[in-house]
């Protein structure tokens, strides 16, 4: 089954290292809060550990199955339709779970997950198939544009502004890699930017007249706190200001594993959105930069592999997966550093969140499958050349 296939350790290695770091930091960041609340301090650690084991099984399965089976059109279309329906149903309150003023989660059979993450992976698969034949632009370009726009709007009104931007960024990268003509590309980009400006202007206008819908209020508060969270240190700027304290406390080498101060009630989302702050406090600037290096190495390796693909669909899948990890990392780190508003976007493979980790692991499995297939094709070419050599020698003799 794995004959002539070679695991790409520059993809798998950083993934495994980030998973282990994340698991240890989830325990460190959550144990004190759970202990004070009278819960098992290891409960989140155990839950994440189980999801990691399950996800590693998904990677093995995804790596083992033929790529053509994973990329069947019916599966891709069904996944896209189901995720779109779940996003729409959330606005109707069906299966929806509201957390911190936002309806981003769906709860089915006791399992909570974000449909936007499922939509993202199937959107990558759909777009890669749409542009699979060649690098020219198909005549029906309006179809993927409408699908991307529809999903982005549904995600935006959860509200999840960062999620909508991520979807647009991933789709934009795939469109660019598919070599869309400059004129059509500029029209698409212009329409996307104009739509975002229109939405932002509408939000500001509604806020001015105190008509802002409740589902956008928390997003507006986060935007207002970007420049100086210390103006409302105990209110809207509470998490951001304490994140700054954590970064400052860490210094160059950190306070040591488990010795974070801000995780003790000062940083409510310490094991999810702000886990990077806890890492920086416990392991210092050196440890934080190492985590970023692993994420950067993972992305760059995926992008590098995409440039070597002869198959257009495989190339675009790698572009989409690499962009997803890179943009999600940038948004998470950018919000922690105060460069952009707080977003609620987790750090890939490090933050607590079983289903998020599972879906991203499936994406890594696809990347490993494509990478190993490239090695297999090279081995076949070498075998053909070796078979031809004796024939050539016999002719010469």
From Swiss-Prot:
Belongs to the SEDS family. FtsW subfamily. Pathway: Cell wall biogenesis; peptidoglycan biosynthesis. It catalyses: [GlcNAc-(1->4)-Mur2Ac(oyl-L-Ala-gamma-D-Glu-L-Lys-D-Ala-D-Ala)](n)-di-trans,octa-cis-undecaprenyl diphosphate + beta-D-GlcNAc-(1->4)-Mur2Ac(oyl-L-Ala-gamma-D-Glu-L-Lys-D-Ala-D-Ala)-di-trans,octa-cis-undecaprenyl diphosphate = [GlcNAc-(1->4)-Mur2Ac(oyl-L-Ala-gamma-D-Glu-L-Lys-D-Ala-D-Ala)](n+1)-di-trans,octa-cis-undecaprenyl diphosphate + di-trans,octa-cis-undecaprenyl diphosphate + H(+). It is found in: Cell membrane. The lineage of its organism: Bacteria, Bacillati, Bacillota, Bacilli, Lactobacillales. Residues 28-44, 100-104, 158-160, 207-277, 337-346 are extracellular. Signal peptide: none annotated. Its EC number is 2.4.99.28. Keywords: Cell cycle, Cell division, Cell membrane, Cell shape, Cell wall biogenesis/degradation, Glycosyltransferase, Membrane, Peptidoglycan synthesis, Transferase, Transmembrane, Transmembrane helix. It comes from the Bacteria. One of its GO terms (cellular component) is cell division site. This is Probable peptidoglycan glycosyltransferase FtsW. The chain crosses the membrane at residues 7-27, 45-65, 79-99, 105-125, 137-157, 161-181, 186-206, 278-298, 316-336, 347-367. Peptidoglycan polymerase that is essential for cell division. InterPro entries: Cell_cycle_FtsW-rel_CS, FtsW/RodA. It holds the Pfam family FTSW_RODA_SPOVE. Its main location: membrane. One of its GO terms (biological process) is regulation of cell shape. It is a multi-pass membrane protein. GO terms for molecular function: lipid-linked peptidoglycan transporter activity; peptidoglycan glycosyltransferase activity. Residues 1-6, 66-78, 126-136, 182-185, 299-315, 368-397 are cytoplasmic.
């Amino acid at each position: 089954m794995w004959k002539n296939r070679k695991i790409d350790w520059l993809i798998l290695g950083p993934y495994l290292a980030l998973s282990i770091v994340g698991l240890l930091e989830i325990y460190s960041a959550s144990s004190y809060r759970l202990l004070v609340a009278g819960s098992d301090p290891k409960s989140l650690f155990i839950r994440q550990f189980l999801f990691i084991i399950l996800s590693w099984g998904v990677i093995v399965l995804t790596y083992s199955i033929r790529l053509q089976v994973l990329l069947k059109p019916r599966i891709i279309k069904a996944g896209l339709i189901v995720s779109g329906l779940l996003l729409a149903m959330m606005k109707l309150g069906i299966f929806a779970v509201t957390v911190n003023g936002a309806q981003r989660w769906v709860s089915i059979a006791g399992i909570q997950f974000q449909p936007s993450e499922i939509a993202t992976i199937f959107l990558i698969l759909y777009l890669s198939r749409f542009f699979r034949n060649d690098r020219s632009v198909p005549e029906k370009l309006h179809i993927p544009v409408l699908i991307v726009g529809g999903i982005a709007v549904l995600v935006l009104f959860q509200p999840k502004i960062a999620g909508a931007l991520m979807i647009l960024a991933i789709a934009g990268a795939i469109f660019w890699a598919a070599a869309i003509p400059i004129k059509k590309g500029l029209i698409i980009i212009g329409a996307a930017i104009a739509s975002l400006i229109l939405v932002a202007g509408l939000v500001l206008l509604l806020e001015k007249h105190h008509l802002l819908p409740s589902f956008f209020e928390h997003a507006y508060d986060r935007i207002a706190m970007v420049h100086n969270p210390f103006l409302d240190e105990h209110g809207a700027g509470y998490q951001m200001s304490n994140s700054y304290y954590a970064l400052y406390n860490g210094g160059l080498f950190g306070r040591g594993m488990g010795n974070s101060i801000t995780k003790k009630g000062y940083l409510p989302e310490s094991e999810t959105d702000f886990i990077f702050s806890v890492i920086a406090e416990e392991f210092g600037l050196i440890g934080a930069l190492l985590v970023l290096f692993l994420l950067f190495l993972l992305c760059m390796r995926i992008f590098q592999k995409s440039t070597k693909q002869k198959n257009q669909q495989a190339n675009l899948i790698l572009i989409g997966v690499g962009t997803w990890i890179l943009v999600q990392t940038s948004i998470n780190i950018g919000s922690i550093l105060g460069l952009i508003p707080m977003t609620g976007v987790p750090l890939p493979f490090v933050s607590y969140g079983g289903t998020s980790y599972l879906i991203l692991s499936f994406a890594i499995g696809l990347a490993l499958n494509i990478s190993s297939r490239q090695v297999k094709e090279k081995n076949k070419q070498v075998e053909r050349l070796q078979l031809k050599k004796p024939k050539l020698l016999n002719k010469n003799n």
